[in-house]
From Swiss-Prot:
The keyword Nuclease belongs to this UniProt entry's keyword annotation: no
InterPro entries: FAD/NAD-bd_sf, Flavin_mOase, Flavin_mOase-like, FMO-like
Gene: FMO2
Protein name, as recorded: Putative flavin-containing monooxygenase 2
Cross-referenced PANTHER family: DIMETHYLANILINE MONOOXYGENASE
GO molecular function: flavin adenine dinucleotide binding; N,N-dimethylaniline monooxygenase activity; NADP binding
Needed cofactors: FAD
Binding annotation for NADP(+): 217-220
Taxonomic lineage from the root: Eukaryota, Viridiplantae, Streptophyta, Embryophyta, Tracheophyta
Alphabetically ordered keywords of this record: FAD, Flavoprotein, Monooxygenase, NADP, Oxidoreductase
Family label: Belongs to the FMO family.
Major enzyme class: oxidoreductase
Record-listed FAD binding positions: 17-21, 38, 46-47
Transmembrane segment boundaries: none
The EC number(s) this enzyme carries: 1.14.13.-
Length: 459
């Protein structure tokens, strides 16, 4: 592979990724003429590469729209499909003329710090530094797919590569009890999402399917399997569930109260299928663990087309899956809806010493205002925190970052930024045992108020 070391400096700001967060960042940073690097040949991010035939938005249109670009037919009560969402994002990019900033088929493979030349230390907790110093701070290596690596130089880099997709998280198994001994087919949900509609249907139809997991992707896949197996030749799909989390009806309206558990248990047959979580609803809300149950999901379960098996440990045998209680499940296809390792993807491009600081201190990236890592200079992160509306969070963080780069306000010291993050983590630890994600749900209003105050806006 050839390396082209001729530095390209057409812009002061780079954006990595053209998904929801990347588009929002490009729109708000448009005055800086950002260079957006997108690894694929189109915009959309996870809505393009991690969706299935049954994938829909988990809210109505008005709850998932950018503030300056409204949905057409926004009053409809139906939930948009992933195709509708892609159409909306493409219309947004066209309306604000964002495509001119994007280099498609351009995968960022390496970042190189060329700032002040000094090795930064964890103990250096002074001022954050100049955001646009007038000279390059980062070199960005881009693979354009033609065997050539191009290097670009920028003063500021905004990472919007996302936490989902690209790097699947897969279970580990005892020796000689992994997928290699299974006679059927094993694939991750990421690989399934790449299949064309006809091939996906052929994979599922007439097959005994096991779906591992009980989050959004797993639930969508189980329903897709059930719908592909209608009729006499149809087979049952079994969901293998380790830790049930609270799920909510597709017509649920966002609210949390002491009555919500009773409401969900009244509306959904969680107890009937042994899916009632062992923890309070508020814990899942506080850690962004909830998933919305699509229409017809429990209808298919009632018909026997979706079954559930709760277990802590499982492994493969030649005909399917064996559980710790000694029971077995015959299967033709096993789909691992076990999530993604977004941090591994990020660590692959971020150099040391910054790579070692990405997950300091609790395995969660310490992002001040959900955007700035206090120990990584001249780099912002959009889309790496979760809330009740990730799209609106990405838009707000992008707007905040644009005003920061424009000098409308300044950052506090690194020490104060880290202290603010630690306070947020303490809130999460008190609210939920599932605090592996940086989730703003329980203090989203306060977070938005803080960002608005920085920007001198009325909350």
């Amino acid at each position: 592979m050839a390396y082209n070391y001729n530095m390209h400096t057409s812009s002061r700001v780079a954006i990595i990724g053209a998904g929801v967060s990347g588009l929002a960042a490009a729109k708000h940073l448009a005055r800086h003429h950002p260079q957006v690097f997108e690894a694929s040949d189109s915009i959309g991010g996870v809505w393009r590469k991690c969706t299935y035939e049954t994938t829909k938005l988990q809210s109505v249109r008005v709850s998932y729209e950018l503030s300056d670009f409204l949905w057409p037919n926004r009053g409809e009560s139906s939930f948009p499909t992933y195709v509708d969402v892609l159409d909306y994002l493409e219309a947004y990019a066209k309306h604000f003329n964002l495509v001119k900033f994007i280099k498609f088929n351009s995968k960022v493979v390496e970042l190189r710090f060329i700032g002040d030349g000094k090795t930064l230390q964890m103990g250096d907790l002074g001022a954050y530094g100049n955001l646009l110093p007038g000279k390059p701070v980062w070199e960005v290596a881009v693979n354009t797919g033609d065997g050539d690596i191009q290097w670009h130089a920028f003063e500021y880099v905004v990472v919007c590569a996302g936490k989902y997709g690209d790097v699947p998280r897969t279970p580990t198994f005892p020796v000689k009890k992994g997928p290699e001994i299974f006679k059927g087919k094993v694939l991750h949900s990421m690989d399934y999402s790449k299949l064309q509609k006809e091939k996906a249907s052929q994979l599922l139809h007439g097959k005994k399917v096991a779906v591992i997991g009980f989050k959004k992707s797993a639930i969508d896949l189980a329903l897709e399997s059930a719908l592909a197996n209608q009729g006499k030749e149809g087979k049952t799909c079994t969901m293998v569930v380790r830790t049930p989390h609270w799920v909510i009806p597709h017509y649920w309206r966002a609210t949390v109260s002491k009555f919500i558990e009773s409401y969900v248990l009244w509306k959904l047959p969680l107890e009937k299928y042994g899916l009632k979580p062992d923890h309070a609803f508020e814990e899942d809300y506080a850690s962004c663990q909830m998933a919305l149950v699509p229409e017809k999901f429990f209808e298919e379960a009632d018909k026997g087309m979706i079954r559930f098996k709760r277990t802590t440990n499982w492994w493969f045998y030649d005909e399917g899956i064996e559980f710790e209680d000694g029971t077995t499940l015959e299967a033709d296809v096993v789909i691992l809806a076990t999530g993604y390792d977004g941090m591994k993807k990020l660590k692959a491009i971020v150099p040391e010493p910054f790579r070692s600081w990405l997950e300091f201190p609790w395995g969660i990236m310490p992002l001040y205002r959900g955007t700035i890592h206090p120990l990584i200079p001249n780099m912002g992160f959009i889309g790496y925190v979760q809330s009740s509306s990730n799209l609106k969070s990405s838009e707000l963080h992008s707007r905040w970052l644009s005003q920061l780069l424009d000098g409308k306000f300044t950052l506090p010291s690194k020490e104060k930024m880290l202290d603010q993050f630690l306070k947020e983590m303490h809130v999460m630890r008190r609210s939920s045992r599932f605090f592996k994600n940086h989730c703003f749900s329980t203090f989203s209003i306060q977070h938005a108020d803080d960002l608005s105050k920085d920007m001198n806006l009325k909350p």
